[in-house]
Amino acid sequence: MSETVFEPTDHPHRRYNPLIDQWVLVSPHRAKRPWQGQQEKLSEEQKPSHDPNCYLCPRNKRITGEPNPDYHKPYVFKNDFSALLENTPAPEQSDDPLFQMGQARGESRVICFSPDHSKTLPLLTALEIEEVIKVWQAQLRELGQKYQWVQIFENKGAAMGCSNPHPHGQIWANSFLPNEVSREDVAQRNYYEKHGSVLLVDYVQKELEKKERIVVETEHWVAVVPYWAVWPFETLLLPKVHVKRLTELTEAQAKDLAVILKKLATKYDNLFETSFPYSMGFHAAPFNGEDNEHWQLHAHFYPPLLRSATVRKFMVGYEMLGESQRDLTAEQAAERLRALSEVHYKER
């Protein structure tokens, strides 16, 4: 009897994520199983450019009763229901190692990407996305003077818990380093001390050589389905050279970031011809007074959809109790995304 030869597209295996020192279980054969579970509701109704009932549109009143200005570019305001507060006092320290508290000071802000209620990121022009990037950079410069971590992110779509359909993102600044970022900080620092080079700079060079997980590439940036991806069509957006923060981008790199963000978001929408839900955000060197040479700027895109516009991946059971698990391989996901048009399906 001949021995079975391992095939990554057929056989279960584990992949290591050096960025957070964790493993993911890959089970490609499970993609063939029938699905009779929950399906998401499609919401493809035509949205107006201005919704009089939307509390993020220009000139409308927000939930607090305060009116929005008649803004024409990206607009930032303090989150009306902030998760973090500026003047939070420090809790009393406990001697009991099982019951510890830490101080959590910070600020939460909202950024409306444009005044147009109907235009998500892929439907904006590259020039309009450039304006969003400029605001991100300005917010980082301001908040980075007061807080060691500033998290820029977007939850797109009801499937990701987005409470308002007007295209917007969030900016949370805090006095502490969050768990995910701390894991990345430790892993990148350890790699730098051991190898004398930057983990994600080495990684991006190898991905550019291999090409099999590249989704879209521009002059200064590349988006890949990372080798260790957890979510079905997860991507990692990376500059091709060492850059620690968004605020350190050259003008050419910033312009090119707008281009690749539009291309990547368009491919996502084109996959199932729907407004593709995801959570995305940037990770970069903290503002903690250290040189942070081990850090590399990058953005994570975590989309939940798996088989169609209505069937999503659920992180439950084994994923919550054991370790993350995915069905299709990173290479299969990249191949599907790479083959998609960079022209949005609504604009063909």
Task: Describe these PLM feature segments.
Residues K244-Q253, L257-K262:
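A contiguous, surface-exposed recognition patch within enzymatic or periplasmic domains that forms
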Residues D256-S275, S279:
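Extended C-terminal subregions enriched in glycine
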Residues M280-A284:
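Acidic/histidine-rich, metal-coordinating catalytic segments
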Residues M1-H166, W172-K244, A252, T266, ...:
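Active-site microenvironments that recognize anionic phosphate/pyrophosphate groups
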